[in-house]
Amino acid sequence: MIFPIRCFSCGAVISEVYEEYRNRLKDGENPEEILNDLEVKKYCCRRMFASHRLDNDRELFDDIVEYK
């Protein structure tokens, strides 16, 4: 759905790097390299990015909103 502000496991703030991650991912960069550059080091935090659906620059939330 909407990208979380904090990691569900450790509570670290992760939303502050989400826009840059999304833009660089859209440009075709490797997700692993992006997260390394953004210094997202914990596996639990990296999981939050890896499991968040982005399909053709649309999030799951964008699809669900259509069915009010």
From Swiss-Prot:
The keyword Cytoplasm applies. One of its GO terms (molecular function) is DNA-directed RNA polymerase activity. Zn(2+) binds at residues 7, 10, 44-45. One of its GO terms (biological process) is DNA-templated transcription. It is found in: Cytoplasm. The keyword S-adenosyl-L-methionine does not apply. One of its GO terms (cellular component) is DNA-directed RNA polymerase complex. Its cofactor is Zn(2+). It catalyses: RNA(n) + a ribonucleoside 5'-triphosphate = RNA(n+1) + diphosphate. It holds the Pfam family RNA_pol_N. Part of the RNA polymerase complex. HAMAP family: RNApol_arch_Rpo10. This is DNA-directed RNA polymerase subunit Rpo10. The lineage of its organism: Archaea, Methanobacteriati, Methanobacteriota, Methanomada group, Methanococci.
